Amino acid sequence: MKMLEQNPQYLYFFSLFLVTIFLYKWLTLKKTPLKNLPPSPPQYPIIGNLHQIGPDPQASLRDLAQKYGPLMFLKFGTVPVLVVSSADAAREALKTHDLVFADRPYSSVANKIFYNGKDMVFARYTEYWRQVKSICVTQLLSNKRVNSFHYVREEEVDLLVQNLENSHSKVANLTELLIEVTGNVVCRVSVGSGDKVDSYKILILEIMDMLGYSRSIEDFFPLLGWVDWLTGLRGKVAEAAKGVDTFLEGVLKEHLSTTGSKYNDFVSILLEIQEADAGSSMDNECIKSLIWDMLGAGTETISTALEWTLAALIKNPDAMFKLQNEVREIGKGKSKISEADLVKMNYLQAVMKESMRLYFTAPLLVPREARQDIKFMGYDISSGTQVLINAWAIARDPLLWDKPEEFRPERFLNSPIDYKGFHYEFLPFGAGRRGCPGIQFAMCINELVVANLVHKFNFELPDGKRLEDLDMTAASGITLRKKSPLLVVARPHV
């Protein structure tokens, strides 16, 4: 596993404390009847199956599933883990038994960043979480609210196009430009101003890296939590949490000190809810946690999805040609594509789906946890078992998809399969109670950016590079970013 490869001192610490852990396990061992568990690869003492998880966990788990089946039982240190790698098993977990698997496991990093679990993404399944989720769905991310911010998206996309035009057909770093346009939209919608993007952009990347699965020893070995202090992780997390709080406190104070209706953003909406219902759960820490959810998840996942989509189109000129024909035909005589035009673009929607299928930004859905003992597909699953849905593996399953490793948007034309959580072979936003409520928010940005870029420009690789030279390797992490930046030459279409 990446943490063991990069930090071999962990194994040293493990060996020093073998006696402690064995004593702990002996003292806490209960005489229980043997359970009918799903198939499991061989485990090592203490670390369980951690040694079998490489730097790309989704690929390692897919390879194990090909040998042991779509339901596997693993041990990550002291933590029992159920790995789901088929659409049928995902449907059982996320629909039939959604409530049982609605909890989140403890994450030491998320707990520190999000004020002891006050956000929506990582919070435990409680009445507090249900209230917060309801507020996000009905007040922040409803269709009406998302549509009300159309002018923000259109203004920022106009600026993106201008920046590319100003490159005068020289090499442009499309990765940076996509992060900028996404960050500006998310920041303006969340806190009222795009000027604050630089204040949190670096923090987001640092925190996303620390939230990556397997970063914290404490999460898998509670008795060895102090190792995170020795390795410096706790210090980094504390510093990041302080940076987040300083930034968000400044945003709150700025809003509270402003009279009138200067702001029309998520912070203002949450402050209004707080003022209207003094007995609600909407305290300042809740507001800050929710805003950081929006800033972090929104900026990182949307910009990453955009980068993969444009890289895939450049890599596959036939798909690019078809998309440009559609967009330019619908946009004929127009200087830009509006959101009203997007609903007419069937091939664009197929391209977006195919990009999300082949290049999952979050290949492993955020882990869930069983709230009670359950008989699941004939197996005994105990309360407290983590549940990992390998959505990346499901979306590349050759039993479900024809030639799954190929970029073929046509597979989604005249297909009922979408990304809203009802088709379990395709789960880019998850499903069930814990599914992402920001689907429309994300897709409005994605489609508008891609449509306008392919409408206005023809893209080439710089320095005479060939299409096969375009690196489509992913960097490991909680989100799968492109390993190398997307450098292009954007020539205006005439």
UniProtKB/Swiss-Prot annotation:
- Swiss-Prot/TrEMBL GO biological process terms: response to molecule of fungal origin
Domain of life of the source: Eukaryota
Q: Where in the cell is it found?
A: Endoplasmic reticulum membrane; Microsome membrane
Recorded GO terms, molecular function? heme binding; iron ion binding; oxidoreductase activity, acting on paired donors, with incorporation or reduction of molecular oxygen, NAD(P)H as one donor, and incorporation of one atom of oxygen; psoralen synthase (NADPH) activity
The EC number(s) attached to this protein equal: 1.14.14.141
Q: Give binding positions for heme.
A: C436
For this entry, the protein name equals Psoralen synthase
Enzyme class per UniProt: oxidoreductase
| UniProt keywords, alphabetically | Endoplasmic reticulum, Heme, Iron, Membrane, Metal-binding, Microsome, Monooxygenase, Oxidoreductase, Transmembrane, Transmembrane helix
* Sequence similarity: Belongs to the cytochrome P450 family.
GO cellular component terms given for this protein: endoplasmic reticulum membrane; intracellular membrane-bounded organelle
Catalysed reactions listed for this entry: (7S)-marmesin + reduced [NADPH--hemoprotein reductase] + O2 = psoralen + acetone + oxidized [NADPH--hemoprotein reductase] + 2 H2O + H(+)
Membrane-spanning ranges: 12-29
Instruction: Copy out the induction comment.
Output: By fungal elicitor extracted from Phytophthora sojae cell wall.
